Amino acid sequence: MIFIEDVTAHEVLDSRGNPTVRASVTLSDGTVASAVVPSGASTGKREALELRDKEARYGGKGVLKAVANVNERIAEVVIGLDAFNQKAIDDEMRELDGTDNYSNLGANAVLGVSMAAARAAAKSLNIPLYRYLGGANASILPVPMFNIINGGAHANNSVDFQEFMIMPFGFSNFRDALRAATEIYHKLKAILNAAGHSTAVGDEGGFAPNLKDNEEPLKLIMQAISEAGYEAGKQIKLALDVASSELYKDGAYELEGKKFSSEQLIEYYAKLCEKYPIFSIEDGLSEDDWDGWAKLTARLGDKIQLVGDDLFVTNEKILREGIQKNIANAILIKPNQIGSVTQTMQTVRLAQRNGYRCIMSHRSGESEDSFIADFAVALNTGEIKTGATSRSERNAKYNRLLEIELENGEFLGDDI
């Protein structure tokens, strides 16, 4: 049996210059692999706990406590375990922590080891990570969601919605979809420049211009699609991440200087969907507004994709409740929201069994680690959300997907 021989961790920096955990796993056959844990900006209340030091260094954001938990506590229980039994490795860490949200060890400690262990096992077998986690049939390239205009918590501007995205559906392969999205991105930059807008980018690589309202980004993106030579609605569709939990105060939604009830905001979305080729709206209502979510799903659930991110936080138990109540029809998948590879896979399988679409997702604080690219293919999520094509930590994922495509991957495209 090939077993885990050593586990270590140290502090590194993410794409926002904040500390995060890099974990390394060494196997008894000499294989060594590592993984870097991402970190979110807008986070759901029920996410697994990201352990920060809360001391003077790095403005309180150091992760030396999480690193110590890997080196001193997690190592003790996973060393000697079968390298190819991912569930046993993850279960051992979960039992050691003893809480539902990893508030003892920190999800950033546990996930780092979980990801590194999976990567080490794949490397030991000399097979790609997506093949190790997904089996022989894992070969479908996801449709990407490119975040090309940022607002909300991801940018310092007057736009309320957090992300305005394009989805290149109408292409026969991933590389052409990637090229189209990139050409639209560059065309958008030229349009913004010509109009005197800032082309500074937000955390995820999208532009963050100071626009007058939440509809102006949609108009600019439609213009960019057309001027780049593509057809909106047929080849390229739009997607929004409203991140509305950030807008929800005292039972109402505050945006564009006005207050909206759940019903009013739902009708606002319905009108946007009539005017623009919107395929997906993420976190259209607050994670606390379940009654509103039921109304949103009844109103638009048969027309567009309604994604729960803060709503479900990649949590199997919460998703099951949402399924029972007919809340949303899709779920964003962020491994660090739940804390381990195994738990992430369990949530995806529950969603897929119940007809919910899955979107593998990055966080705003990312790294050069491309784990989620393989994970999306492994789990056949069908969609991936990992930013614009302008920052290296985002392009690391797209470039990995290009590699996977060379290994006979198929692109989902319109079959989504």
Swiss-Prot record:
Known EC number: 4.2.1.11
Species assigned in the record: Campylobacter curvus (strain 525.92)
Necessary cofactors: Mg(2+)
GO biological process, one term: glycolytic process
The protein's name: Enolase
Catalytic-site annotation from UniProt: E204 (proton donor), K334 (proton acceptor)
Chief subcellular location: cytoplasm
Reported function: Catalyzes the reversible conversion of 2-phosphoglycerate (2-PG) into phosphoenolpyruvate (PEP). It is essential for the degradation of carbohydrates via glycolysis.
Subcellular location: Cytoplasm; Secreted; Cell surface
Annotated Gene Ontology cellular component terms: cell surface; extracellular region; phosphopyruvate hydratase complex
An example molecular function term from Gene Ontology annotations: phosphopyruvate hydratase activity
Catalytic activity: (2R)-2-phosphoglycerate = phosphoenolpyruvate + H2O
TM regions (residue ranges): none
Pathway(s) annotated for this protein in UniProt: Carbohydrate degradation; glycolysis; pyruvate from D-glyceraldehyde 3-phosphate: step 4/5
